[in-house]
Amino acid sequence: LIESLGLGAFTVHTGVYEPAFPPDVGNDEVAAAAGYDIGEIAGRHDRAYATEAMSEGMEKLIPRLYEQGKFDGILSFGGSGGTSLVTPAMRALPIGVPKLMVSTMASGNVSQYVGTSDILMMPSIVDVSGLNSFSTKIFSNAVFAMAGMVSFESKQQIEHKPLVAATMFGVTTPCITRAQEYLEQRGYEVLVFHATGAGGQSMEALINGGFIKG
């Protein structure tokens, strides 16, 4: 379906057994990225161990592949195991890179999967196990959404101004708005984060990433 839209499909095998079709990146390469041997992982017959090992490999390998220009967006389908395996790799990618996770876990608390990143979570409605009339529609919608994100980039001109972070509650909105106007008049760009939920964590992630100047 991806290729029928005129896009390229770059596949990564995250399972521990033989794939259903030849992937672009084999599970041996994924495992090796974190110092594991795929034969040893498969030989244990331990789902939790395999998930953790392959997740570590994905977290290290996926950002490297992105830097090499192998893909422009990442799309994955999974249940609880697949979601916990792939989302750490998604979180390791820069903000702005399209990331879409179709998951059985998407209708609940997804903070452990999304963290401070911009992962989009889409409920799979039915289990991610084969194709049926419902899953085919959901999976197709996910492909179309990803195709749109990688095909249509924002044309807005980005001005590289020094970034200043501010946190805000509803009751402090007038104060922060006034401070924002003051700083922007002096050549700064102000990023406002909600002071509850993941807002503060997102701000700290950008600070740790070296984006924030004050």
Q: How would you name each of these model-derived features?
A:
Residues 73, 85-114, 123, 191-195:
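Short, acidic/small-residue loops that bind anionic groups at enzyme active sites
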Residues 80-88, 109-111, 172-177, 200-201:
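Short glycine/serine/threonine-rich phosphate/pyrophosphate-binding segments
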Residues 41-50, 62, 71-78, 162-169:
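Short glycine-rich or small-residue beta-strand-to-loop segments that form or flank ligand, phosphate
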Residues 1-29, 159-197, 208-209:
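Glycine-rich phosphate/diphosphate-binding loop of Rossmann-like nucleotide-binding domains
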Residues 42-43, 109-171:
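Cap/lid and interdomain-hinge subdomains that line or gate substrate/regulatory clefts
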Residues 13-17, 79-80, 104-107, 126-127, ...:
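Short, ordered loop/turn segments at secondary-structure junctions
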Residues 107-116, 201-207:
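Glycine-rich, charge-decorated loop segments at or immediately adjacent to ligand/cofactor-binding or catalytic sites
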Residues 22-68:
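Phosphate/nucleotide-donor binding subsite
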